[in-house]
A protein has these predicted regions:
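Short beta-strand/helix segments in adaptor/scaffold domains that form protein-protein interfaces
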Residues: 1-127
Length: 127
């Protein structure tokens, strides 16, 4: 639980317009924010089979700092890593499998980022 979420526990409690989202909707939204941030912050990062584990850890620790995050797991598919002439490659979205557990005021959701081979695209989903 970050300092931000402790100091702003009711961040979404202010009604906006004619609709106030449910706690579950807020938790799902927060999960999407976390996975989107993870994807866009790290795709393109230099990575090799030697550094993949430390990059996974950095990704997990970075996202775990954000509000409402209970758990983060990240796996980089080592079979997809391709080294250039200098011995490393770039992290691609299709290499990332990530899962976040979000707890917003007692409502918990789990979301996943995973490459969909059929669509040839990394997709997020609630699980």
């Amino acid at each position: 639980c970050s300092a931000f979420s402790r100091s702003h526990p009711a961040l979404y409690d202010q009604p906006g317009g004619d609709y106030t989202p449910t706690k579950r909707e807020i938790a799902a939204f927060e999960a999407g924010i976390k996975l989107g941030a993870l994807y866009h912050q790290f795709v393109g990062a230099p990575v090799s089979s030697r550094t993949a584990a430390s990059l996974e850890k950095a990704m997990q620790e970075s996202i775990s700092l954000q509000p409402y995050v209970r758990e983060v797991k990240v796996h980089i598919d080592r079979d997809m890593l391709a080294a250039n002439v200098f011995g490393y490659g770039e992290l691609e979205g299709r290499m990332i499998e990530a899962q976040v557990v979000i707890d917003y005021q007692g409502e918990t959701v789990t979301a996943r980022l995973q490459y969909d081979q059929e669509k040839d695209y990394p997709l997020m989903s609630l699980v």
